Amino acid sequence: MRFAIVVTGPAYGTQQASSAFQFAQALIAEGHELSSVFFYREGVYNANQLTSPASDEFDLVRGWQQLNAQHGVALNICVAAALRRGVVDETEAGRLGLASSNLQPGFTLSGLGALAEASLTCDRVVQF
């Protein structure tokens, strides 16, 4: 089956993103296709490359990045939600006159169209 995941919780502070990541790993391990992960609302914090967990904690931001690199899973970040929460790529940082960007490599700023497309092309969409 082909899946898409929607993550609405931050990398740390709630269980949503961690559960979504574990679900994503289980899907791939069972031979399913994970087409994309769409990060919305506070979920956009999963793409902040400035996140620095304690040395004894799992680095969820880099975990998502590794999922993208190893399995080609698209990591789409809602651009409107990201800008409101201070998560920007180089293009948006330049456009807004910000000194730097903080979008973790492997993540892409995108609109709700990416979520709509995933909903149309996947067998299941699971929200965390």
Swiss-Prot record:
One of its GO terms (molecular function) is sulfur carrier activity. Coiled coil: none annotated. GO terms for biological process: tRNA wobble position uridine thiolation. It comes from the Bacteria. Transmembrane segments: none annotated. It holds the Pfam family DsrE. Its EC number is 2.8.1.-. The keyword Cytoplasm applies. It is found in: Cytoplasm. The active site is at C78 (cysteine persulfide intermediate). Signal peptide: none annotated. Belongs to the DsrE/TusD family. Part of a sulfur-relay system required for 2-thiolation of 5-methylaminomethyl-2-thiouridine (mnm(5)s(2)U) at tRNA wobble positions. Accepts sulfur from TusA and transfers it in turn to TusE. Heterohexamer, formed by a dimer of trimers. The hexameric TusBCD complex contains 2 copies each of TusB, TusC and TusD. The TusBCD complex interacts with TusE. This is Sulfurtransferase TusD. The lineage of its organism: Bacteria, Pseudomonadati, Pseudomonadota, Gammaproteobacteria, Enterobacterales. The gene is tusD.
